[in-house]
């Protein structure tokens, strides 16, 4: 079985500028998140920007880092970079009513296992929201046959690529 660090190294240099969800998956995503409190992410250069598909939402949420823990706040500008060089809102208005998480990852399996950056930040956050819908977003080229799973890893409910979607449970 391949190590997670080797997988991360292989996936960190991929280019996502041409990524686009198919019309079918845009509709599918909007069906899943319609009229729900959605926490999305502010993409970095290694993550897919799906936020332009979420323009109909007047109030989106996102994550921010506080004492090495992810928390949730309203998505608003301007952005600042945290200590890991990840953008987050400069003004944090905390929220706790999240119903759906749109989650980036370096890779996913069709079984919902996520390969993150190795700090377990999303796993710790998601463990507090067991009833929330968890949707992993990745390019098809980041769909992996297997990712080693640890006890604390949280499975996704769905994984979406450009043209495919996988319901996990």
Kindly give the residue locations of the regions a language model identified.
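Conserved phosphate- and dinucleotide-binding cores of soluble alpha/beta proteins
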Residues: 71-169
